Amino acid sequence: MKVTLIAILTCAAVLVLHTTAAEELEESQLMEVGMPDTELAAVDEERLFECSVSCEIEKEGNKDCKKKKCKGGWKCKFNMCVKV
């Protein structure tokens, strides 16, 4: 009887520890709503700048603005890179 009780208590303790660890992992992987993703914002600003500069340089040379700078799901529109 003692062995069965010890086994049940051990199993319960392991279950509690496992559940707690899983909850902590889930919380650490969630993003907080309202926090800006600064890395994505920096990439967006960089693409906007590259596209604007590229278009302006090509327009000054009396050529049509060729949209070469925006790649990877982005396109140049109104001298700005926009997500497609």
From Swiss-Prot:
Tissue specificity statement from the Swiss-Prot or TrEMBL entry: Expressed by the venom gland.
Has keyword Flavoprotein? no
Record's SUPFAM superfamilies? omega toxin-like
- Keyword Transit peptide among record annotations: no
Note the InterPro entries from the entry: Hwtx-2-like
Cellular location of this protein? Secreted
Gene Ontology MF, one: toxin activity
All disulfide bonds of the chain are C51-C65, C55-C76, C70-C81
The alphabetical list of record keywords is: Disulfide bond, Neurotoxin, Postsynaptic neurotoxin, Secreted, Signal, Toxin
Q: List the PROSITE patterns.
A: HWTX_2 (PS60022)
Which GO CC terms are listed, alphabetically? extracellular region; host cell postsynaptic membrane
Q: Which family does it belong to?
A: Belongs to the neurotoxin 12 (Hwtx-2) family. 02 (Hwtx-2) subfamily.
Q: What does this protein do?
A: Postsynaptic neurotoxin.
Mind telling me what this protein is named?
A: U4-theraphotoxin-Hhn1a
